[in-house]
């Protein structure tokens, strides 16, 4: 058994090195930014998957073509072959690509990429190896100044463990980014349930929307590497017309809404939504007035602008079915500021608050922001607005990594300064996330 595990890890490391080598070659030779380099690499992975579905393989470069390009000469046959494949990719994934999209790699970078990947199958190789390699590859990019704001894996896994998704439950992230919450939910379900149909879960139960096509492609690729089935990752502005959003998720399993919403909506420097057409479709797009009974009523006056994450709160509650559960990352000010008392009233009117968990300031520093945040867990419950119930509240103090740009892991140590290890000899992270999860279960 140990030999199989070592072999699997070896395959993962080799594939990770291959991905990194390709990325570094493009970055060094083509003058693209690191984010642009990642985008081009993802395009090629989609092209390869399309080719692997065909009987006649076109994703290759022969020795003569490669030598020609390395000697600064063109190989029109090779370039045309790959461009034709990309055209088929655009047709297959029209929700993630535009007709005007092109592969923006130089002939040499494209040739090197195809050469590195042509003898490897994305569809038929081990899901564990390729999925883990791609996840490690992405985590390197996310922590290395790639310009995008992602959610730390530790926080994602924590939220999923709190809500404990089940195999038959529908899950959506309306601001999915690279798909972290969806992949973590999938892994949680597979780990805690035997004989689960992974294809059914991915094709029927997992949904992710993102306004950014490049980021949505990453989320889709992560699920495609788990199993090659139709996925429900879409490039959608989740704050636009609600009926339009619902059309994107219409299925037997989501007719009455979703069982679980997990999301980290854009906030901080994202600015405000000022489009009156969008604001008018949200209760929280209007101004609210406090009554003499310390309640709030919505007025007929639109806000001049509303921050994105507040509109996302309403949209997420809308997406839930009655009794559905939600976990969302929010700035601490939403729980404290007097000017947002109406928001807290709105949430309490439509949901039961399951818990609030405060995160340390350093949580998101390795991922691009120092905004203090908390996690809000709620259950949609519109029928019992007049009720009192105990509220779980906790504060995370140790997250298992440093609060700096690198976000290096921090491990538990004994009195001699030696790193503590578990029964499998793995170093034990210095964190209290797992303690809070157990506290919540016992609450």
Regions found by a protein language model. Give the residues of each.
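A conserved structural/catalytic subdomain of Rossmann-like adenosyl-cofactor enzymes
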Residues: 1-4, 248, 253-443
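Accessory nucleic-acid engagement/destabilization modules that flank
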Residues: 1-56
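Non-catalytic, well-ordered alpha-helical scaffold segments
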Residues: 20, 35-47, 111, 127, ...
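Class I SAM-dependent transferase core
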Residues: 25, 129-154, 160-163
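Alpha-helix C-capping/helix-to-loop hinge sites
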Residues: 25-29, 48, 116-121, 140-144, ...
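Conserved phosphate/pyrophosphate-binding and hydrolysis machinery centered on Walker-type P-loop NTPases
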Residues: 35, 103, 123, 127, ...
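Long recognition/docking surfaces used for binding and targeting
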Residues: 43-139
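Conserved S-adenosyl-L-methionine
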Residues: 148-263, 268-273, 330-333, 338, ...
